UniProtKB/Swiss-Prot annotation:
The modification Phosphothreonine is found at T198. Belongs to the protein kinase superfamily. CMGC Ser/Thr protein kinase family. CDC2/CDKX subfamily. Residues 429-456, 492-505 have a biased composition (Low complexity). ATP binds at I32, G33, E34, G35, T36, Y37, G38, Q39, V40, K55. This is Cyclin-dependent kinase C-1.
Length: 505
C-alpha cells in the first residue's frame, strides 16, 4: 500500500471518521491516563467485547468549540496508516452530561462529551520500564528502538512532526509491538515552510537544544533528539537529562554534549536566547566518557543522535541503517518477547503516590503514639574508673543521652554470677553520628557502575513531565519512499542475513 502524501491540514473541514455512535456503546473499565487534554480509559465495547482505549477530549476550557489541537490530532491520525503508529478507530459522543468511570458527573460545563476510540495497548514504555525487577535485554532494546525509528521515519516521510516523543507516548502490546501515540502536539510541515512554529513543545527532559534556545523554524531533527534521549535511557536504566527548568535543562545538555559555538553549530550565536543561556565557561563533549559502559555500536549511534546542531543530527532512516541493528545480538522478533501485566505510567505513578501516602500516614501515627518509655528502671551500678558517657539514641532499649549506660541489676546480668566489673573504654560505641549504609549521590552521570549494555536496575522513578495518556494512530501497512528516496522498507532490507527487519528467527 502506497503511503499517503499530504501537506498542511485544512482545519476548516469537519474532523474525519466522525461517527454517529454514542459512548454508551462502551463500558469504562479503568482510567489509564490523564493530561491536559482529558482522560484515557480502558473500555469494553458492549456488543463485541472488544477492549479499546477511550480518550476523552477536554472541552471545559474551549470557548470557541472543538479544540484545534484535537482537530489536528484527528486529521493527522486519519492520514497515517502504519503498524508502528497507533490506530484511531472512530469518534463517539456522549449525548448528556458525561460521567467518569465511578459514575460521578464530570466538570464539563458543556452538555455532552467527545471521545476518540483507539486500539488498546497493554503498556507504555515508561510504565513497563518502571516495573520492579524488570530488565530489558539487548535484543529487546534493539527491537523497541527499531520499531520506534521505523514508525517515526514513516511520520517524517509523510511530513508529520510528532513533537512529544517520550516513554509514556510509546505504547507496547503483549505481542511486543511498539506504536507511536499521542499526536496532540503533532503537526504537518514542509521543507519550504516559511512561517514560525512554536518552540513550547516536547516534554522538557526530551526537548532538543534548538527549541530551548528559542528556534521557531525546525524539522524532523527535533524528534531525533528525543529518540536519542529514549535510547540512552533504555541503556542507562534512568533518564539522562532530568532538568527542573529550561536553564537547568540546557546546562545538563551542555555538560554532556559540550558548549555550542559557531564552529560546531553555525548560526547558534544568533539564536534568540543564546546570550541568556550560553555556558559561562567552555565545556567539552563527554558523551563517550559518561556512557563508556555502552556497547561500541550503541555508543556510535547515540553520538549521532545527541548532536547539538540539528542539521548534523542523524535521520530516522539513516539510524535504521546503523551497525547497531546489524550486529549480534540482533533485534529479536516482537512476538518472542515476554508478556507482562498491564503497565501504564499513570497507574505506576498512582501506585507510588499511594505508597508515599501510606508511609506518611505511618510516620504520623508513630509521632502521635510514640513507644512507651520504661517507667521503672533498675538502679545504676557504679564502680571503678569513670568514663565519658557515650551518645545513645533515646528510646526504650537505650539509656538517655548524656548519662552513663544503665545496667539492670540481678544475677542474670552478671558474668557467670559474678558482679559486673568497671565499664571498659571499648564497651560502647563512641558518641556522635555513626556511619552506615550508602551516602551516594544519585545525580550526574557517574552514580555507579552499570552493566555493559541493557537494563541494570529498573528506572529511577522521577518526574517525567506531564503524565498523559498517550493514545493517539492507523492500520498497519505502508511502503516507504518520499523525500528520503527509495521504495522499499527502511534499513538494509531482508537480504542481509536472510532476516526480515533484522530479527532473529
Amino acid at each position: 500500500m502506497a503511503m499517503a502524501s499530504f501537506g498542511q491540514l485544512n482545519l476548516e473541514e469537519p474532523p474525519p471518521i466522525w461517527g454517529s455512535r454514542s459512548v454508551d456503546c462502551f463500558e469504562k473499565l479503568e482510567q489509564i491516563g490523564e493530561g491536559t487534554y482529558g482522560q484515557v480509559y480502558m473500555a469494553k465495547e458492549i456488543k463485541t467485547g472488544e477492549i479499546v482505549a477511550l480518550k476523552k477530549i477536554r472541552m471545559d476550557n474551549e470557548r470557541e468549540g472543538f479544540p484545534i489541537t484535537a482537530i489536528r490530532e484527528i486529521k493527522i491520525l486519519k492520514k497515517l496508516h502504519h503498524e508502528n503508529v497507533i490506530q484511531l478507530k472512530e469518534i463517539v459522543t456522549s449525548p448528556g452530561r458525561d460521567r467518569d468511570d465511578q459514575g460521578k458527573p464530570d466538570n464539563n460545563k458543556y452538555k455532552g462529551g467527545i471521545y476518540m476510540v483507539f486500539e488498546y495497548m497493554d503498556h507504555d514504555l515508561t510504565g513497563l520500564a518502571d516495573r520492579p525487577g524488570l530488565r530489558f535485554t539487548v535484543p529487546q532494546i534493539k527491537c523497541y528502538m527499531k520499531q520506534l525509528l521505523t514508525g517515526l521515519h514513516y511520520c517524517h516521510v509523510n511530513q508529520v512532526l510528532h513533537r512529544d516523543i517520550k516513554g509514556s507516548n510509546l505504547l507496547i502490546d503483549n505481542e511486543g509491538n511498539l506504536k507511536l501515540a499521542d499526536f496532540g502536539l503533532a503537526r504537518s510541515y514542509s521543507h519550504d515552510h516559511t512561517g514560525n512554529l512554536t518552540n513550547r513543545v516536547i516534554t522538557l527532559w526530551y526537548r532538543p537544544p534548538e527549541l530551548l534556545l528559542g528556534a521557531t523554524k525546525y524539522g524532523p531533527a527535533i524528534d531525533m533528539w528525543s529518540v536519542g534521549c529514549i535510547f540512552a535511557e533504555l541503556l542507562h536504566a534512568k533518564p539522562i537529562l532530568p532538568g527542573k527548568n529550561e536553564q537547568e535543562q540546557l546546562n545538563k545538555i551542555f555538560e554532556l554534549c559540550g558548549s555550542p559555538d559557531e564552529k560546531l553549530w553555525p548560526g547558534v550565536s544568533k539564536m534568540p536566547w543564546f546570550n541568556n543561556f550560553k555556558p559561562a565557561r567552555p565545556l567539552k563533549r563527554r558523551v563517550r566518557e559518561f556512557f563508556r559502559h555502552f556497547d561500541r555500536h550503541a555508543l556510535e549511534l547515540l553520538e549521532k543522535m545527541l548532536v547539538l546542531d540539528p542539521a548534523q543530527r542523524i535521520s530516522a532512516k539513516d539510524a535504521l541503517d546503523a551497525e547497531y541493528f546489524w550486529t549480534d545480538p540482533l533485534p529479536c522478533d516482537p512476538k518472542s518477547l515476554p508478556t507482562y501485566e498491564s503497565s501504564h505510567e499513570f497507574q505506576t505513578k498512582k501506585k507510588r503516590q499511594q505508597q508515599r501516602q501510606n508511609e506518611e500516614a505511618a510516620k504520623r501515627q508513630k509521632l502521635q503514639h510514640p513507644p512507651l518509655q520504661h517507667s521503672r528502671l533498675p538502679p545504676l551500678q557504679h564502680g571503678g574508673q569513670s568514663h565519658a558517657a557515650p551518645h545513645w539514641p533515646a528510646g526504650p532499649n537505650h539509656p538517655t543521652n548524656n548519662a552513663p549506660p544503665q545496667v539492670p541489676a540481678g544475677p542474670s546480668h552478671n558474668f557467670y554470677g559474678k558482679p559486673r566489673g568497671p565499664p571498659g573504654p571499648n564497651r560502647y560505641p563512641p558518641s556522635g553520628n555513626q556511619s552506615g549504609g550508602y551516602n551516594q549521590s544519585r545525580g550526574g552521570y557517574s552514580s555507579g557502575s552499570y552493566p555493559p549494555q541493557g537494563r541494570g536496575a529498573p528506572y529511577v522513578a522521577g518526574p517525567r513531565g506531564p503524565s498523559g495518556g498517550p493514545y493517539g494512530v492507523g492500520p498497519p501497512n505502508y511502503t516507504q519512499g518520499g523525500q528520503y528516496g527509495g521504495s522499499g522498507s527502511s534499513g538494509r532490507g531482508q537480504n542481509q542475513r536472510n532476516q526480515q527487519y533484522g530479527w532473529q528467527q
